[in-house]
Design a protein with these regions (language model features):
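Acidic, low-complexity Ser/Thr/Gly/Pro-rich repeat segments typical of extracellular/periplasmic
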Residues: 19-193
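Sec-dependent signal peptide recognition
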Residues: 2-8
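C-terminal motif of bacterial Sec signal peptides marking the signal peptidase cleavage site
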Residues: 14-16
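Sequence-level preference for short, compositionally simple segments enriched
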Residues: 189-206, 210-502
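Short, linear, compositionally biased motifs with a strong N-terminal bias
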Residues: 10-12
Length: 502
């Protein structure tokens, strides 16, 4: 009798032992998957990332391997590298023109652009947004019991069937021994969105795209029509880099609801060994930001949070373009948390970072916005006349207790000085603030103006008696005409009148 009971239980025991403890996204057998999907595995407990093995994606019809991630390659650099005296700014402006958009499918990652040398392929490398030099990236990111796999961008296509294999040891968790051929299959949507001017992004796959980058990749270069990209509430952990995009509105569900972020900085994605970046117009593009709009004009970002997850020279948002508007956007970075090049309008937004919170050679007009740092200068403004620098109207600046902040510095940077630097503050409030106002003004010719500043706690006029000798307090009556000009965005932003009700 006991033998019969035991034999009857054998099929149940076998089924229990063969049950996969992991859930998959896209689900096994899923159809209608967006080609820009990440691959997500949810384990019963926190997995560990192995140091070797492969994750591969195959075309189920042809058997061809369409993508391969080698876990033996490190994600990127973890220590700053040393640059020699031969590293300098390019002698010719960077060329943004292109006859086609390079991707991982048609171009070898690491192919140099501009005057750069080839990017070494001894670490993870992927082309994002057509930047052929490539970005270092994490092939797998683990948070708690969720492992997210990042295929190389733009390799999956519409109307295809795929299966995924994961070597044993790539992800280590009790009961998980990898994924074998044919066990994890899915098929992509037959074709892209019918309405190419109104695109939706949702991390759960319910939109036209799973990623912000996927939606931006779908926008043609220099498109004259407006493209509206709506990003659903959710967490979007990805590097976003777009170039040559125009007339795009990217809308989230609110700065507390839609977050786009990545662990990126100058160490992880440094500039080339022989080419400097950031300082001059036409310089080699930077790859260190979590979110970058490069050579992009007439863009609106609204109702979202953009952040980097690393410290150092680490932009949350890097902007290079004309007429870029930020509305109800929270930007989180470290040093150079916001890099602003071009003409930028910022309203009802927040910026959180470390010293030199704002870097840039462009013009920034900020209205009703809040700026927080962990002590030190809020800016290292580098504008050159006739362009204006940074202007703040009815904004708030705040440091930390015992670590006061200041408006900024314009001190010498190597051989470079900033005689045209401009930083103007009108009717703003401060808290935990350096009585000098500006920690360093390198040139007497710099335009450092202030009017109507109040203490955020008392509401009383701020004590400006110790302000830097090269700064000037504007008189509301005597300087009324100049104050009115600085409060006019069009006067500051080279004739552009941004909407104040976006």
């Amino acid at each position: 009798m006991k033998t019969r009971i035991f034999l009857a239980l054998l099929p149940l025991l076998a089924a229990a032992c063969s049950t996969d403890p992991v859930s998959y996204f896209p689900a096994k057998g899923a159809a209608g998957v967006n080609p820009d999907t990440h691959l997500v595995l949810t384990f019963p407990s926190a997995p560990a990332l192995g140091e070797a093995g492969f994750i591969r994606i195959f075309d189920a019809r042809t058997g061809a391997c369409v993508d391969s991630l080698d876990l033996s390659l490190p994600a990127g650099l973890t220590e700053s590298r040393t640059y020699g005296p031969e590293c300098d700014y390019a002698a010719v402006p960077y060329d943004y023109s292109r006859d086609f958009i390079p991707t991982n499918k048609n171009t070898l990652p690491g192919t140099p652009s501009g005057t750069a040398e080839p990017t070494p392929r001894d670490m993870q490398l992927t082309i994002i947004g057509g930047f052929t030099d490539g970005f270092r990236f994490h092939p797998v990111i683990i948070h708690n019991n969720v492992a997210t796999i990042y295929p190389h961008n733009n390799l999956l296509e519409y109307g295809r069937d795929y299966y995924v294999t994961i070597d044993p040891g790539v992800l280590v968790c009790e009961g998980f021994r990898g994924v074998k051929k044919g066990a994890w299959k899915f098929s992509t949507k037959a074709k892209g969105p019918a309405d190419t001017r109104h695109l939706t992004v949702a991390a759960d796959g319910s939109g036209d795209f799973n990623t912000v980058q996927g939606a931006l990749d779908a926008v043609p270069d220099f498109c004259k029509d407006t493209t509206w990209i709506t990003v659903a509430a959710g967490d979007y952990e990805e590097i976003v880099y777009a170039r040559n995009k125009t007339n795009v509105v990217i809308s989230g569900a609110g700065m507390d609801a839609t977050k786009v972020h990545y662990a990126n900085n100058e160490v992880f994605n440094p500039h080339p060994l022989l080419v400097k970046t950031n300082e001059w117009p036409g310089t080699f593009p930077s790859r260190r930001a979590a979110f970058a709009l490069d050579n992009c004009d007439d863009i609106v970002l609204r109702d979202l949070c953009i952040a980097t997850d690393l410290y150092g020279q680490a932009e949350g948002l890097l902007l290079h373009g004309e007429r870029i508007g930020l509305y109800r956007v929270r930007i989180i970075g470290s040093g150079d948390a916001l890099q602003a090049n071009g003409t930028i309008y910022m309203q009802d937004s927040e910026l959180i970072g470390d010293g030199d919170t704002i870097l840039g050679r462009g013009t920034l007009f900020a209205l009703h916005s809040k700026f927080y740092n962990h002590g030190g200068p809020f800016s290292w403004v580098r504008n050159v006349k006739p362009a204006h620098g940074d202007v703040f109207v009815e904004c708030h600046f705040e440091g930390l207790p015992g670590r006061p902040a200041d408006y900024g510095r314009t001190n010498k940077n190597g051989r470079t000085t900033y005689p045209d630097a401009e930083f103007v503050v009108i009717d703003c409030t401060t808290r935990h603030f350096n009585p000098l106002g500006w920690s360093a003004i390198g040139e007497k010719s710099a335009t450092m103006l202030e009017c109507g500043t109040r203490d955020a706690d008392t509401g009383q006029p701020a004590d400006v008696s110790q302000r830097h000798k090269y700064s000037r307090q504007l008189d509301p009556k005597r300087d009324a005409a100049l104050i009115a000009q600085y409060k006019n965005p069009a006067w500051v932003l080279a004739g552009w009148t941004p909407s104040q009700s976006f």
